[in-house]
């Protein structure tokens, strides 16, 4: 397994380009299954999960044309079968997103129960229940979700018991081709959900209310082709901004948007960062100062994102004062804290809250990534620490960050990949 070797205590300084959002690209790639004509998806990040989703479509017989800029043209009508096998689904939870489009467009689907990051129980029962309300006949057997429908799905009024991003996306895609009106209540409001809705609208779907807790979808008979560019990755944007703040540096991130990152930018300003923004860029400057500790509570969008708490935990570890981080979205999301403690962080865990007292500096150590965002926090810790840090199991990082060591090198970091 590859590792990252980081030599710390250098403030980051420079400019980088932000990649397309993986969490928007995956549902949009799944949505191409709904169209009768080719759909081209642009601004895709070069990531393992994207490759897996493209491979999954290819395994089903879907014809794909990929250019050198990672734009993909998808011809869903060439599909041969409707089976998403365990060996692909186990590596990526988002494979469940093909369930709704397959049932809605082709009347059947067989999708393995998902795998992915080891952060708590993320149930798929809301997807299944919603599709059943729309008339799908679903059995779960031998580790597979097997769904069928006679004719078109029917619009339904669906209340989601908990806010679920992939559940909202799956049901919104299915409803786009259903007969009649579907209302999704307690829907996820994340920018990636909005981006999927905008792509579906570009394909001819009739959707209103995306970005609010109530989405209304009037089903249409068919969806046509379109060309759609995926929105920028707000978590990648936030990660590089926090890395610069934690090291007392300056960074300008380009090809991104501030409007999808407001909760994070407010916390960075609270930590003492000077932030300026333009139409497609954000600049952060710590002016050489040590960050101030911040307290935060994660919750679904537009509140503070769970995918950014690990990075702030790393920053708090060397900040002035102490801060409390409360995780309300997922259990098991503090696995990185033990590794930070091994590097000298002063952290007390109380249930779903972590109290972090800033220390003058961390010390480099061998550490191990446990999930995608935890691994980003360990990289940030390594950038701040005295001496060398080796981050193991970085396949987690490669699932969510495109060329992380190359982008950090552009910002002046001493970081390199050690091949297995």
Swiss-Prot record:
Metabolic or biological pathway, per its Swiss-Prot or TrEMBL entry: Cell wall biogenesis; peptidoglycan biosynthesis
EC numbers, comma separated: 2.5.1.7
GO cellular component, as recorded: cytoplasm
Entry's Gene Ontology BP terms: cell division; cell wall organization; peptidoglycan biosynthetic process; regulation of cell shape; UDP-N-acetylgalactosamine biosynthetic process
Alphabetized GO MF terms: UDP-N-acetylglucosamine 1-carboxyvinyltransferase activity
Gene behind the chain: murA
PANTHER family: UDP-N-ACETYLGLUCOSAMINE 1-CARBOXYVINYLTRANSFERASE
Active site location: 117
Stated family: Belongs to the EPSP synthase family. MurA subfamily.
PTM-bearing positions, type 2-(S-cysteinyl)pyruvic acid O-phosphothioketal: 117
Protein name, UniProt field: UDP-N-acetylglucosamine 1-carboxyvinyltransferase
């Amino acid at each position: 397994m590859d590792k990252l070797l980081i030599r710390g205590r250098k403030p980051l300084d420079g400019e980088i380009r932000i990649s397309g959002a993986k969490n928007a690209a995956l549902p949009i790639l799944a949505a191409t299954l709904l169209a009768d004509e080719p759909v081209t998806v642009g601004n895709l990040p070069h990531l393992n999960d994207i490759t897996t989703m493209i491979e999954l479509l290819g395994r089903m017989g879907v014809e794909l044309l990929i250019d050198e800029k990672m734009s993909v043209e998808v011809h869903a009508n060439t599909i041969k079968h409707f089976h998403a096998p365990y060996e692909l689904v186990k590596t990526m939870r988002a494979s469940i997103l093909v369930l709704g489009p397959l049932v809605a467009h082709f009347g059947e689907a067989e999708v393995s129960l998902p795998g992915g990051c080891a952060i708590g129980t993320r149930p798929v029962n809301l997807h299944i229940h919603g599709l059943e309300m729309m008339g799908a006949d679903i059995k779960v057997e031998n580790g597979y979700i097997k769904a069928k429908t006679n004719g078109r799905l029917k619009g339904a009024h669906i209340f989601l018991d908990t806010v679920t991003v992939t559940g909202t996306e799956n049901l919104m895609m299915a409803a786009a081709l259903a007969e009649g009106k579907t209302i999704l209540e307690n829907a996820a409001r994340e920018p990636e959900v909005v981006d999927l809705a905008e792509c579906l609208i570009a394909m001819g779907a009739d959707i209103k209310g995306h970005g609010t807790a109530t989405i209304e979808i009037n089903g249409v008979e068919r969806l046509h082709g379109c060309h759609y560019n995926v929105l920028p990755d707000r978590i990648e944007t936030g990660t590089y901004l926090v890395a610069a703040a934690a090291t007392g540096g300056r960074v300008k991130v380009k090809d991104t948007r501030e409007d999808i990152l407001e909760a994070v930018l407010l916390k960075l300003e609270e930590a003492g960062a000077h932030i300026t923004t333009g139409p497609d860029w954000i600049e952060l400057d710590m002016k050489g100062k040590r960050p101030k500790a911040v307290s935060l509570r994660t919750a679904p969008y537009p509140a503070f994102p769970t995918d950014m708490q690990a990075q702030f935990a790393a920053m708090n570890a060397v900040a002035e004062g102490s801060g409390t981080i409360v995780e309300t979205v997922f259990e098991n999301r503090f696995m990185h804290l033990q590794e930070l403690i091994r590097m000298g962080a002063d952290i007390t865990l109380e249930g779903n809250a972590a109290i972090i007292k800033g220390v003058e500096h961390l010390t480099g150590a061998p550490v191990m990534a446990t999930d995608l965002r935890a691994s980003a926090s360990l990289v940030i810790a390594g950038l701040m620490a005295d001496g060398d840090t080796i981050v193991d199991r970085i396949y987690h990082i490669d699932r969510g960050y495109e060329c992380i060591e190359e982008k950090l090198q552009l910002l002046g970091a001493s970081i390199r990949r050690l091949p297995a």
